[in-house]
């Protein structure tokens, strides 16, 4: 069993017009299933149920992209212009060995054609993988700024709150650890700009948005990742914090 850990920061504000607590969510440009397939995080055996499930969780456009058998296009759908040549070569050789050499992709296309429905692009809390010797909190702060453009001085960390969630996909366990922050008063206005101007953010995500609890529940019902068990307690913590603060 492989463990993959990501660290995130739930950053909240009180919307001064609606008088509701909101948090920032980001939407990835690609599904987790698509990323796992392109990076060859799967096994080839007689039972292809895990692969079919993986294809089920991809968007229709992602499945169509794989059916082209053009690994360059698949790779750069995730990485865009990022120069990761060594990793690319390693994954391409595995893709070629698994699917192109045996039958020129016929088996792969057949498996994709068995997929039913389609996945959605996830809305999630800004998060990412820690660098070597990087603390959990430092990772959460760095990833949050990379994905939203909001600097450390623009919010206050609430150290009493720390939550985690785990789920399994095939032979991989995904563990997410979350810290909590509240936005500075000067940035609470509803029209606060969230931009995608930095290349690091463009490469990973397609949308950034403030969402209240009703929206979080709606989003969670439409995707495989349920955000409510994490964001719900965070909002309750913020309510108590604001109550005692005032």
UniProtKB/Swiss-Prot annotation:
Keywords: Early protein, Eukaryotic host gene expression shutoff by virus, Host endoplasmic reticulum, Host gene expression shutoff by virus, Host-virus interaction, Hydrolase, Magnesium, Manganese, Metal-binding, Multifunctional enzyme, RNA-binding. GO terms for cellular component: host cell rough endoplasmic reticulum. Mg(2+) binds at residues 134, 143, 147. Its EC number is 3.1.3.-, 3.6.1.52. GO terms for biological process: AMP biosynthetic process; ATP biosynthetic process; symbiont-mediated suppression of host gene expression. Residues 91-239 form the Nudix hydrolase domain. This is mRNA-decapping protein g5R. It comes from African swine fever virus (isolate Tick/Malawi/Lil 20-1/1983) (ASFV).
């Amino acid at each position: 069993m492989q463990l993959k850990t990501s660290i995130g920061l739930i950053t909240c504000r009180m919307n001064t017009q609606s008088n509701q607590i909101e948090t920032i969510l980001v939407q990835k440009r690609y599904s987790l299933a698509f990323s796992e397939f392109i990076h060859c995080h799967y096994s080839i055996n007689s039972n292809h149920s895990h692969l079919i499930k993986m294809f089920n969780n991809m968007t229709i456009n992602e499945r169509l992209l794989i059916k082209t058998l053009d690994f360059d296009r698949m790779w750069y759908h995730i990485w865009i212009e990022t120069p990761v040549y060594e990793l690319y070569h390693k994954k391409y050789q595995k893709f070629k060995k698994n699917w192109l050499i045996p039958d020129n992709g016929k088996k792969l296309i057949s498996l994709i054609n068995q997929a039913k429905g389609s996945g959605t692009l996830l809305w999630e809390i800004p998060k990412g993988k820690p660098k070597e010797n990087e603390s959990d909190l430092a990772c959460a702060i760095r990833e949050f700024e990379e994905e939203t453009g909001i600097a450390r001085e623009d919010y206050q960390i609430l150290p009493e709150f720390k939550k985690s969630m785990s789920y399994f996909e095939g032979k991989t366990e995904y563990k997410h650890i979350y810290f909590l922050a509240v936005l500075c008063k000067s940035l609470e206005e509803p029209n606060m700009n969230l931009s995608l101007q930095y290349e690091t953010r463009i490469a990973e995500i397609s949308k950034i948005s403030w969402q209240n609890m009703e929206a979080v529940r709606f989003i969670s019902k439409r995707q495989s990742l349920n955000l409510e068990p994490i964001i719900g307690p965070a909002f309750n913590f913020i309510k108590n914090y604001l109550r005692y603060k005032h």
